[in-house]
A protein has these predicted regions:
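Chalcogenol-based redox active-site neighborhoods
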Residues: 18-197
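Bacterial N-terminal signal peptides that target proteins for export
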Residues: 1-8
Length: 197
């Protein structure tokens, strides 16, 4: 049953985006409780954009198959994003306690990238993403994560937005495998960096 739940979560997360914001749209500004290396803080998109482009990546849930891969790939490539002048923030419907663990976990975020809590799904919805509560009759609330713990919340679509300092969406990446999502995001910020330079 555990494997079936994880498989369903990965399947739904790989589906194409429903009606996500597109290139040229204004990215909704947000502040959210977040964690970096297990330490809580308030993440502000407006503040992050003052330093350069921001990769805002929505993922279904910490400690699930595809999300673990995606966080790990962002962490191991974090210096490449920084070299292109971009920062990265993950957003999920996980509570902050779960994100404190995930952000510090050396296998996943590895203390390199912040993850923000969107517990009610309001940020995801503002980016025109679906918040999914069940798939084929199985509730995300009762699915188990890779540690055997109940996920306990709904899930946002796996979609990544590249937001430029002027607050516009430069790219929307969805409907691809977690590792490909990260590589496409890196390509997008590197292209932005080349245009700027």
């Amino acid at each position: 049953m555990k494997r079936a739940g994880l498989g369903l979560l990965m399947l739904v997360a790989a589906l194409p985006t429903f009606a996500a914001l597109k290139q040229g749209d204004s990215a909704p500004q947000f502040k959210a409780q977040a964690s970096l290396a297990g330490k809580e803080f308030t993440f502000s998109l407006a503040d992050a954009l003052k330093k350069g482009p921001v990769v805002v990546y929505f993922y279904p849930s910490a400690y699930t198959g595809g999300c673990n891969v995606q966080a790990h790939e962002f962490a191991v490539n974090y210096d490449k994003f920084a070299a292109a002048g971009a920062s990265v923030v993950g957003v999920s419907l996980d509570n902050i306690s779960r994100l404190n663990e995930f952000s510090a976990d050396p296998e996943y975020c590895a203390g390199k990238l912040p993850v923000a809590s969107d517990a009610k799904g309001d940020i995801a919805k503002s980016y025109d993403l679906q918040v999914i509560t069940e798939y084929k009759g199985q509730s995300f609330l009762t699915m188990k994560d890779t540690r055997g713990k109940e996920i306990g919340h709904a899930a946002a679509e796996r979609t990544t937005f590249i937001v430029t300092p002027d607050g516009k969406v430069a790219a929307t990446i969805g409907g691809v495998a977690p590792k490909d999502n990260v590589m496409k995001a890196l390509e997008a910020v590197q292209q932005l960096s080349q245009k700027k330079g």
